């Protein structure tokens, strides 16, 4: 038996070696065939022009293949515009909104390039959506026009708004705009927009559900982001500044421009840092929400504004969980606006500016204010006179080194006599305005603690200039606790 095993082993090894050699030759031949096929496909792919590839159904468009210079040495405006035109020309039977072609998620990939731009990258006027532009840098050249934006989404039939458009203008424009939305579901992500002190970053008109995510806007002189008309533009996780600084810039007094301006409804600004500009955010539309924003643009002491809420009388705006760093919130005739859970540093406050003297549905609650105790800047200040005030609650704010202001006042006054005076003029926001009064009268007896005078008639006898007076018909040693509301 042992002899048989010994004689069999050489034959077994010979078979194994032959099998391995055969497998190796087959694997080598297969690899050779695969390489030849890949080379053939690559040659076919390279033989097509970029426009033919896009029209043929490719879902990724590379501007570099159209002649865009990723190094920034040459102008790439025309190449990027041509790439967008080919992306918009992709055949599709599907639609998003009526008349808006669904491009199926086509991707315009900047491939991390640094592109020099001499004219705006204007999207085609044909209505379309479901497209992504990502991953690169767009820099304005010295020839770039100072009144335009690096990227512009507006159709030739769209109507641009003036800088002073009011709610009535927006409302009438909406009624007179039968053609509606031209762009939908377009995403910009991971892009640096460097305007080179020539104009702005991105301009969006008559569009719906636009996303601007994880982008950086630098060196703008007009607006970093400007949105007009349409609705539901979501701006998130972005940084915006005219000058690259981390605060305390020696040229802060000269900061100009606006980081974000929304002349549009139903938009959201989330998790944004604005580090240099004259104005951080301008809101000229309704039903917008601003949350998680850090504004340390030009300080209010230098004439800057962190957030400006316009659209007097129709604001309907929510500002939550924001950090106002030496820069104020200014609201014009705010109606249905709330400011909550914010942090105001360096005498940053909230200014209510009168246009027609109307305030309604305003809520400023649960915020923290910190400032210079020597200045005692009021946390809420009035700019003008308000004659129509309704449903305003300013309360429950914590204050350190600034002047507390509220629409609710509490005070206890002790005295031995017939009159108790509570002065709320240093606390209440609106002058000479108290709508509700509650008070409790605690009598400790007569002037000599005579119990015979513990129960005496008393009443509010005067309410003028936010001063409340309570009087009794007999002298008494008592404490009066007041609660007033505006």
PLM region spans:
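Extracellular "leader-to-stem" segments immediately downstream of a signal peptide or signal-anchor
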Residues: 1-134, 138-190, 247-248, 393, ...
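Short, conserved, surface-exposed binding loops centered on an aromatic residue
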Residues: 282, 310, 330, 413-414
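Extended, hydrophobic interaction surfaces within ordered domains
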Residues: 5-32, 339, 349-398
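Right-handed parallel beta-helix
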Residues: 130-139, 182-195, 208-219, 231-249, ...
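A structural signal for short secondary-structure junctions
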Residues: 311-314, 323, 333-335, 345, ...
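Extracellular beta-strand/beta-solenoid scaffold signature
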Residues: 80, 85, 118-123, 144-179, ...
């Amino acid at each position: 038996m042992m002899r048989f095993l010994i004689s069999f082993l050489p034959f077994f090894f010979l078979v194994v070696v032959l099998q391995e050699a055969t497998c190796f030759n087959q694997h080598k031949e297969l690899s050779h065939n695969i390489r030849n096929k890949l080379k053939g496909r690559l040659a076919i792919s390279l033989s097509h022009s970029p426009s033919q590839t896009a029209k043929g159904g490719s879902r990724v468009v590379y501007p570099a293949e159209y002649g865009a210079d990723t190094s920034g040495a040459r102008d790439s405006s025309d190449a990027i515009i041509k790439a967008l035109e080919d992306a918009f020309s992709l055949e599709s039977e599907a639609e998003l909104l009526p008349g808006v072609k669904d491009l199926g998620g086509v991707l315009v990939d900047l491939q991390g390039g640094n592109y020099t731009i001499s004219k705006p990258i204007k999207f085609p006027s044909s209505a379309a959506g479901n497209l992504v532009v990502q991953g690169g840098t767009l820099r304005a050249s010295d020839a770039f026009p100072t009144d335009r934006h690096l990227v512009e989404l507006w159709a030739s039939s769209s109507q641009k708004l003036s800088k002073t458009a009011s709610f009535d203008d927006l409302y009438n424009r909406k009624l007179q705009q039968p053609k509606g939305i031209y762009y939908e579901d377009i995403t910009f992500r991971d892009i640096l927009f460097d305007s080179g002190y020539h104009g702005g970053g991105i301009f969006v008109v008559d569009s719906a559900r636009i996303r601007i995510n994880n982008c950086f806007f630098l060196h703008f002189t007009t607006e970093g982001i400007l949105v007009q008309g349409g609705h539901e533009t979501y701006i998130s996780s972005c940084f915006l500044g005219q000058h690259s600084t981390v605060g305390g810039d020696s040229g802060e007094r000269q900061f100009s421009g606006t980081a974000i301006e929304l002349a549009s409804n139903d938009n959201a600004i989330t998790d944004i840092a604005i580090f240099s500009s004259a104005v951080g955010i301008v809101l000229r539309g309704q039903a917008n929400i601003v949350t998680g924003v850090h504004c340390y643009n030009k300080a209010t002491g230098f004439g800057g504004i962190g957030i400006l809420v316009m659209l007097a009388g129709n604001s309907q705006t929510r500002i939550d969980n924001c950090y106002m760093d030496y820069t104020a919130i200014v609201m014009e005739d705010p109606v249905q606006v709330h400011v909550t859970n914010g942090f105001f540093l360096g005498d940053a406050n909230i200014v209510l500016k009168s246009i027609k003297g109307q305030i309604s549905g305003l809520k400023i609650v649960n915020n923290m204010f910190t400032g210079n105790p020597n200045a005692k800047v009021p946390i809420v200040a009035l700019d003008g006179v308000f004659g129509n005030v309704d449903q305003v609650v300013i309360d429950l704010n914590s204050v350190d080194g600034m002047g507390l202001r509220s629409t609710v006042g509490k005070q206890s006054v002790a005295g031995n006599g017939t009159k108790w005076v509570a002065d709320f003029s240093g606390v209440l926001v609106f002058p000479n305005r108290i709508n509700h009064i509650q008070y409790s009268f605690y009598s400790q007896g007569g002037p000599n603690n005579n119990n015979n005078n513990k129960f005496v008639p008393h009443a509010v006898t005067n309410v003028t200039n936010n001063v409340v007076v309570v009087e009794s018909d007999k002298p008494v040693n008592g404490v009066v606790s007041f609660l007033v509301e505006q």
